[in-house]
Amino acid sequence: DSSPSRGLGDVYKRQIRENIVDGTTPVIFLHSWGSDSLGSWFKILPKIKNETSFVAIDMRNHGKSDASWDRWDVDENADVVISILKELGISSCNIVGWSMGSAVAMSIAKKNKPLVNKLVLITPFSWLGGAVYSDKVAFKIFVSFVRIRERLFPNFNPKSKFSFLKKSNSINDEYTEWAWNNLHKSKDDFIYADGGRFVVPYDARSWIQEIEAETLVITGGRDKLVPEETSNDVVKRLNEVKVKTFPDAGHSVPWTHEEDLLTELREFFSL
């Protein structure tokens, strides 16, 4: 654990991890779908803990935050993050969002413009049609299949994630026990239910141009989950944006290309 941890469970039923460095603008880290704040950022947070303040939040149905079958969406997650930052007394911040986290980050930047100084979107998407999921019904069937699989073989998905981390040399030996335990704590049945309810219907194309924050978009040249052309749909709608592509990276940039990512974050945020 790279930083002090604070839970706001009594108020928001959300788990947060907060690190404070006096005189710095806090960076808010928003994780990917099916992960959590530590699972997504365990290779990033320890290396910047002396350079900047940060807050990492477990979003709904992920990590140590609450689990519920009630319908929720990206905008609700954005509202919760905004409320947490208000409770923490944060009036200006930088935000880093990966995949699903990038969707929440964009919503925050639209809803509360004075709050967001700079925005980093890693493998972002504006909607899940076109290049990736041309048939939403088919994706819903896929999500249903995965949910059934998780009930029959509850360890399958955590084992798959762990295998990927090991094969891609994303975790060193000292992290293996932690990674194994962390992955097996995920709320997979809830996570994949969310896929059908809020990931598929998400569509930000009509309002992305309202975002005013200076933005850095980071993509992976070999990303098969959110290909470059899908992220480019975000880029073309943003007003003030820079793009960095890691040619040999897939979707898991914070796991496989953490040093490249850290270089970009330090330069963009002037850490």
Task: Enumerate the predicted regions with their spans.
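Conserved HGGG/HGGXW glycine-rich cap/lid loop of the alpha/beta-hydrolase fold
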Residues: 19-64
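Single conserved hydrophobic/aromatic residue that forms the stacking wall/gate
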Residues: 1-12
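Active-site loop/oxyanion-hole signature of alpha/beta-hydrolase fold enzymes
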Residues: 42, 55-96, 263
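Catalytic active-site module of serine/aspartate enzymes centered on a nucleophile-bearing elbow/loop
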Residues: 241-271
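Gly/Ala-rich beta-loop-alpha elbow adjacent to hydrolase catalytic centers
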Residues: 97-101, 105
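Flexible "cap/lid" loop of the alpha/beta hydrolase fold
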Residues: 110, 118-149
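Conserved alpha/beta-hydrolase catalytic His-Asp/Glu region
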Residues: 130-132, 136, 151-209
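Short beta-strand/loop motif that positions the catalytic acidic residue
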Residues: 211, 217-219, 223
